[in-house]
């Protein structure tokens, strides 16, 4: 189940065309729990399973530049990040990207510090949004795009009831491979007036973005097809 979830949501990371992917992982209940009344595993069980999967994934594939981290667990789901350390390091090696992320409160001294900052950002957002009575990350259920992408789609209006709803940390889009110019424009335009909408909202180069989205769709489709016919995660990593 976990491996299929990784392929479905992080195929482009495995293939090396995307620095990171953010997604929800929902472990199945064990067989001995099949007759109980609970709908899903408790957070402690989810945290334990997610941590085991992330640890094993990282142990196996970190030498090939890919790792997995658990960012947070709530309501029976784990928010997980599969990333390429070298690509994240390259991102923060770009002066404009580093300045943007640093201004947003990220530690840009290295990939691990960057992931740690992301964990703090996402946890803080979730806590504030939950306190405001809004939807939590546990309600993101779009398997075609990652969690941060889903938050940018127009079909997902803000459900917060506060006069000043907590702002989603849209700067995370840069870590997921979205162009910095589009992330900046998305923030400046309050998520409106885009020229094209797909994995992210494109403001600067819609045709280039569409080509990129198509390449991502093809990568994901091919990876899933290979996985279903017996390919291992190791074989899918570029």
Regions found by a protein language model. Name each.
Residues 1-35:
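Short, extreme N-terminal leader segments that mark the start of a protein/domain
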Residues 10-15, 67-73, 118-127, 162-163:
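Short, flexible, solvent-exposed loop/turn segments with mixed acidic/basic and small polar residues
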Residues 18-20, 75-78, 169-171:
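Short, surface-exposed beta-edge/turn micro-motifs
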Residues 36-112:
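A glycine-rich, hydrophobic loop/mini-helix early in the fold
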Residues 38, 117-164:
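Intrinsically disordered, low-complexity terminal tails and inter-domain linkers enriched
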Residues 111-126, 160-169, 194, 201-217:
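C-terminal alpha-helical interaction appendages
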Residues 166-196:
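Hydrophobic/aromatic-rich, well-ordered segments within soluble, folded domains that form packed cores
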Residues 199-238:
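Long, compositionally biased
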């Amino acid at each position: 189940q976990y491996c299929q979830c990784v392929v479905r949501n992080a195929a482009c990371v495995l293939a090396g065309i995307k620095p990171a992917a953010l997604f929800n992982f929902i472990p199945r209940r064990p067989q001995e729990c099949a007759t109980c009344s609970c709908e899903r595993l408790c957070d402690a069980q989810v945290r334990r399973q997610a941590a085991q999967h992330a640890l094993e994934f990282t142990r196996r594939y970190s030498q090939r530049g890919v790792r997995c981290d658990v960012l947070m667990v709530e309501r029976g789901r784990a928010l997980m990040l599969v990333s390429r350390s070298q690509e994240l390091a390259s991102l923060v090696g770009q002066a404009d990207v580093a300045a943007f992320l640093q201004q947003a409160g990220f530690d840009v001294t290295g990939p691990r510090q960057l992931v740690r900052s992301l964990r703090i950002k996402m946890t803080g957002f979730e806590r504030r949004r939950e306190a405001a009575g809004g939807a939590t990350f546990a309600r993101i259920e779009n398997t075609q795009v990652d969690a941060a992408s889903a938050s940018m789609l127009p079909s997902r209006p803000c459900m917060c009831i506060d006069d000043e709803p907590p702002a989603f940390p849209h700067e995370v889009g840069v870590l997921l491979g979205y162009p910095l110019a589009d992330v900046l424009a998305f923030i400046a335009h309050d998520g409106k007036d885009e020229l094209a909408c797909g994995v992210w909202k494109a403001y600067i180069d819609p045709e280039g973005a569409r080509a990129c989205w198509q390449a991502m769709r093809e990568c994901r489709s091919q990876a899933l097809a290979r996985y279903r016919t017996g390919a291992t995660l190791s074989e899918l990593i570029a």
